Amino acid sequence: MPKFALLVDLKAKLGKESEVEAFLEKEATLVRGEPGTLSWHAAKVEGEPGVYKIFDTFNDEVAREAHLKGEAGQELAANAGKLFSVTPKVYRLQVVAQK
């Protein structure tokens, strides 16, 4: 069972929603090349225009740090000002239960 996770809150700038979704598709492609990232999901929050979440899981802190410092993390940081109305908020989580 994965023990470590990240939850990222994203708020698209008005009118940038389609660009954000294309960016998230690109991020998914980058993350597929990360052996330590066990799962990665990007989702749009229903009923909250422009609000997105990313949730990903890892077996250990080393893998989580590699992900944050890797290409996907760098791309998120580099594009944050262009795509998002507020700085993305990254929560470091410890998984306590799963199906």
Language-model features and meaning:
Residues 26-38, 57-91:
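An amphipathic, aromatic/His-enriched active-site/gating alpha helix that lines ligand/cofactor pockets
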